[in-house]
Amino acid sequence: MNIIQQLEAEQAARLSETKTIPEFQPGDTVIVNVKVVEGERTRVQAYEGVCIARNGGGLNENFVVRKISYGEGVERVFPIYSPLIDSIKVVRRGKVRRAKLYYLRDRRGKSARIAERTDDRAKKAKATAAE
């Protein structure tokens, strides 16, 4: 491991102590709470949409969230370790077979829907652990 990788690993460990980042993949619907600065005040704004891509790795990892706002598609790129991100919450898991869901940009209505992923193995594991 070279020095840069070691420094990035230390930084990632330090940043993940203060903030928990859930595991999510493209296709998952997420709520990203973003800190917005307006003059003197800061407030938290929720941005809910479908994660359509994850890029990069380590400290430089980004994810793209797409939502439809007033009939217009809006995409926003968030760095995972950004100090402006207050929290990330996964609302539902999507069942997709691609890493990049850029084809959703051309789709409207029902064709833009993503089926929900049901993890039967995870449910069975929780049920056996509860017994």
From Swiss-Prot:
Residues 110-131 are annotated as: Disordered. Keywords: Ribonucleoprotein, Ribosomal protein. Belongs to the bacterial ribosomal protein bL19 family. The keyword Nucleus does not apply. SUPFAM superfamilies: Translation proteins SH3-like domain. One of its GO terms (cellular component) is cytosolic large ribosomal subunit. The lineage of its organism: Bacteria, Pseudomonadati, Pseudomonadota, Alphaproteobacteria, Hyphomicrobiales. This is Large ribosomal subunit protein bL19. The gene is rplS. One of its GO terms (molecular function) is structural constituent of ribosome. This protein is located at the 30S-50S ribosomal subunit interface and may play a role in the structure and function of the aminoacyl-tRNA binding site. One of its GO terms (biological process) is translation. The keyword Ribosomal protein applies. It comes from the Bacteria. Residues 113-122 have a biased composition (Basic and acidic residues).
